[in-house]
């Protein structure tokens, strides 16, 4: 097995759905199924915050979601927990700046996908040099889903990464909706990551389809 290519990674980031049990008002397994039917390109399991599952319940839930992703041939990424990613044999892991260091993560994950949230050009250069496959850049817009976010960067912040010669695949993070997706892609992102735009939508399927259309139209 070898590391994922830049071109392949770029395609996978198109519509990146992030979800935990506490991000949904409907059955999360059904929400994920609808999102997959609508053609999300990658899924991240993020079980954090108020009301999140813990211990065995969390692991069992992750396995259920992973099995559904496998049915559809969509990569299953674990948020911030390298040990769980290894235990589940997940397709990859996504870490933040306050989590385990990129060098250690890459060593443990081998050739699997490693994504890193970055907020500055310096952080980006460091994680690229040490094995990141893609960057999560943001928050682009204000978000209520994540309580521990940094200052809003706007699409200008995202464009700045490209202007400074960062060529690695980038997914925009934070407050992204169907309405503002085009502006994120036009600023230089390869894709958009969303939580509530799909998890709280009246129809996760319809919302995903619209996001896919917006990304395709803007690339």
Curated annotation (Swiss-Prot):
Q: Which organism is it from?
A: Bacillus anthracis
Give the protein's recorded name.
Thiamine-phosphate synthase
Where 2-[(2R,5Z)-2-carboxy-4-methylthiazol-5(2H)-ylidene]ethyl phosphate binds, per the record, is at: 143-145, 175, 195-196
GO term, biological process aspect, one: thiamine diphosphate biosynthetic process
Q: Give the family this protein belongs to, as stated in its UniProt record.
A: Belongs to the thiamine-phosphate synthase family.
Q: Where does Mg(2+) bind?
A: 80, 99
| Reaction equations catalysed | 2-[(2R,5Z)-2-carboxy-4-methylthiazol-5(2H)-ylidene]ethyl phosphate + 4-amino-2-methyl-5-(diphosphooxymethyl)pyrimidine + 2 H(+) = thiamine phosphate + CO2 + diphosphate; 2-(2-carboxy-4-methylthiazol-5-yl)ethyl phosphate + 4-amino-2-methyl-5-(diphosphooxymethyl)pyrimidine + 2 H(+) = thiamine phosphate + CO2 + diphosphate; 4-methyl-5-(2-phosphooxyethyl)-thiazole + 4-amino-2-methyl-5-(diphosphooxymethyl)pyrimidine + H(+) = thiamine phosphate + diphosphate
Q: Which domain of life is it from?
A: Bacteria
What are the entry keywords?
Answer: Magnesium, Metal-binding, Thiamine biosynthesis, Transferase
SUPFAM superfamilies registered for this protein in UniProt: Thiamin phosphate synthase
EC numbers, comma separated: 2.5.1.3
The cellular component terms of Gene Ontology attached to this UniProt record, alphabetical and capped at eight, are: cytoplasm
The record's PANTHER family line, in alphabetical order, gives: THIAMINE-PHOSPHATE PYROPHOSPHORYLASE (PTHR20857), THIAMINE-PHOSPHATE SYNTHASE (PTHR20857:SF15)
Q: Which cofactor does it need?
A: Mg(2+)
Q: What does this protein's record comment on cofactor binding?
A: Binds 1 Mg(2+) ion per subunit.
A GO molecular function annotation here is: thiamine-phosphate diphosphorylase activity
């Amino acid at each position: 097995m070898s590391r994922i290519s830049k071109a392949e990674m770029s395609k996978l980031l198109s519509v990146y759905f992030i979800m935990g049990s506490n991000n949904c008002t409907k059955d999360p397994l059904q929400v994920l199924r609808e999102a997959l039917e609508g053609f999300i390109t990658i899924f991240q399991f993020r079980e954090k915050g108020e009301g999140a599952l813990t211990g065995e319940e969390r692991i069992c839930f992750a396995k259920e979601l992973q099995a559904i992703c496998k049915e559809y041939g969509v990569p299953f990424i674990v948020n911030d927990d390298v040990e769980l990613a290894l235990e589940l044999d997940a397709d990859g892991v996504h870490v933040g700046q306050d989590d385990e260091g990129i060098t250690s993560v890459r060593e443990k994950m081998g050739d699997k996908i490693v994504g890193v949230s970055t907020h500055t050009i310096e952080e980006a250069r460091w994680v690229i040099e040490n094995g990141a496959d893609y960057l999560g850049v943001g928050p682009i817009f204000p978000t209520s889903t994540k309580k521990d976010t940094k200052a809003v960067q706007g699409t200008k912040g995202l464009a700045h990464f490209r202007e400074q010669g960062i060529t690695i695949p980038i997914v925009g993070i934070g407050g992204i909706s169907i309405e503002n997706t085009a502006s994120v892609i036009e600023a230089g992102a390869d894709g958009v990551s969303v939580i509530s735009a799909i998890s709280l939508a009246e129809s996760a399927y319809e919302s995903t389809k619209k996001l896919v259309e917006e990304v395709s139209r803007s690339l």
